[in-house]
Amino acid sequence: MKSLPVIDKARILRTPEDRFAHIADFPYVAKYVEIGGLRIAYIDEGPREAAPILLMHGEPTWSYLYRKMIPGLLAAGHRVIAPDLVGFGRSDKPSAKEDFSYANHVAWMVGWMEAVDIQNATLFCQDWGSLIGLRMVTHSPDRFARVVLANGGLPTGTQGVVPKAFKIWRAFARFSPWFPIGRIVNSGCAQ
């Protein structure tokens, strides 16, 4: 695995806390760990002695994605831990495009996992969270008891051809002057 990147504080953006103050259905207080100069936010709810369920969100969301799942998991007696990936939600956002590599995201989240000391976890991951979360499992399999994968996978890099649909999405995300993030997230949610 790549060594932990350290980001210059002058190149870090941070969303003000008051932007999260009145969000419906998400009463959870964020905790923070600093990894490589970045503040990574996460929620940690439920009994400390319970084996955790680690919820890894996809792109372009944050831990808020799981707001409908968290109450049920807590009611069942589980501990729930849900980080905001770097660049999303309450976590810091590097301002330099070159800092946003897949290797950096994996290194940051492995560092976070070690700092929070995730043990005996059930990983629930989807979308971009699966690409990072499954690498966390391969890095430290002894920290995980179970894996639940939704809408994701772990490409080996040997497929040779990037799917056309992904190329179209990447071009849209990179070059579109109009990026309706709310509509994009909403279109992937049950109504």
Where does each model-flagged region fall?
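Short acidic-hydrophobic surface loop/beta-edge motif
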Residues: 31-35
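Flexible "cap/lid" subdomain of the alpha/beta-hydrolase fold that forms the substrate-access gate
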Residues: 2-28, 38-40, 45-52, 65, ...
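The serine-hydrolase catalytic nucleophile loop
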Residues: 59-70
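Short hydrophobic signal-anchor/transmembrane segments that target glycosyltransferases
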Residues: 72-74
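Structural cue for short, hydrophobic secondary-structure segments
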Residues: 55-58, 82
